[in-house]
Amino acid sequence: MASQASQVLASPHPAISSENRPKADFHPGIWGDMFIICPDTDIDAATELQYEELKAQVRKMIMEPVDDSNQKLPFIDAVQRLGVSYHFEKEIEDELENIYRDTNNNDADTDLYTTALRFRLLREHGFDISCDAFNKFKDEAGNFKASLTSDVQGLLELYEASYMRVHGEDILDEAISFTTAQLTLALPTLHHPLSEQVGHALKQSIRRGLPRVEARNFISIYQDLESHNKSLLQFAKIDFNLLQLLHRKELSEICRWWKDLDFTRKLPFARDRVVEGYFWIMGVYFEPQYSLGRKMLTKVIAMASIVDDTYDSYATYDELIPYTNAIERWDIKCMNQLPNYMKISYKALLNVYEEMEQLLANQGRQYRVEYAKKAMIRLVQAYLLEAKWTHQNYKPTFEEFRDNALPTSGYAMLAITAFVGMGEVITPETFKWAASDPKIIKASTIICRFMDDIAEHKFNHRREDDCSAIECYMKQYGVTAQEAYNEFNKHIESSWKDVNEEFLKPTEMPTPVLCRSLNLARVMDVLYREGDGYTHVGKAAKGGITSLLIDPIQI
């Protein structure tokens, strides 16, 4: 059996015929072997000592007593935006708890900047602070006061705070329209570094941005602010570079695994996007303690991409039936019923999950992999239904298409698999909760699915024979493409409100669990706003990979 499989896998293009197959034209991978070589990850003793001393200084400053708790807000905000808050989670939580308790006492005389900053920071940490605090910035007619238009810093904070809104907070819906218009008008008149802050915010809000990308950007802005704290800035720069070294080491290991699989030669119809996949998973969790989870989840997303392309871009429907059956049975013996080229991806898929089980066995956590397998099986079952529609030339209703398209986004699978490589915070109850289609996972899935649908239709990224959610909606409801985009965007915005709502205390699950769905939604906002930035690697992916994985920060 093993020798037979080896002979099959050794063939470069086993039994691949182009007759009656779907056609896809993916551009080749753009990174080559750039990340194969692992950089030196050792740091000298002097830098390590400085790093620990600076960390202690920052911790002390977070906890330092002040007369007015609002004075702490800008420093806590800087710690978060510079990307180092993961070192001080308990200290920040304690300080914000105190600020939340003092909110009513300190609210009367606060300006727009302080009110909005406090609102955003507390909401980011799940405190259910009321948006009524913004009513005092409205005039008798119910509009935001004209005097606010000259307070650019305050407008910027109100703009960012508005992205924390939940359902029913009309004042924040109004605030985002008001601040977007006013900041856009003010932008040409601003000077550095405020101009950079406003310009970037209008393109990417804090709430929906990828934390590492945003940290890299904010470091360059923060160092030019007159009010910057030198110790905090230096600590953030060293921390960024240390994390970059860790991430490069992980990516080097993954790229060697990918190169050994040789899919670019053996399965030339599939996308070569392992670096982009790692960048995606860095967005899900970047912290050092999730190193194992990152490596496992990157391999899973890489295999999911290959499987997706098999269903969507190469295999015939008759081949997909036994392929789906083999994945459902999850048994290497099922390889015998598959075409030779499918054996390659099937064996690799099973190997990835077997490796996960081996890595988790010592911790007694291998049970988690069973949940991940079930999630992958549900994904391919949804892929098969979509392939069946195409094969039968069946045009589903929008509701039929949507109900199957949510699973085919892969986001429920990724959310569940992300839990596998996390620590003690994950229990069997976590997976049972995830399997119940909780609001936050469903919301992040809708964001993924609908942003993908808009991107594919708007930028002509789908093949003519493919079903399209936008086309289904246009045909069923007799609307234009733009009207369909608008409707989909309403669902996306509503889903972001659901995500925000699920973070308000008390929560169903611990924050680290909820953060996986939040971060999955953030990846979509960054990579898919201007098209499918994964398949057709665009500016966001290239820029993010370059800034996070290639260019260190000059210290």
Swiss-Prot record:
Annotated GO MF terms: (+)-delta-cadinene synthase activity; magnesium ion binding
Keyword Metal-binding annotated: yes
Pfam families: Terpene_synth, Terpene_synth_C
EC id: 4.2.3.13
Keyword match Cell membrane: no
Residues at which Mg(2+) 2 binds: D308, D312
Cofactor note: Binds 3 Mg(2+) ions per subunit.
Domain notes: The Asp-Asp-Xaa-Xaa-Asp/Glu (DDXXD/E) motif is important for the catalytic activity, presumably through binding to Mg(2+).
Protein known as: (+)-delta-cadinene synthase isozyme A
Designated gene of the protein: CAD1-A
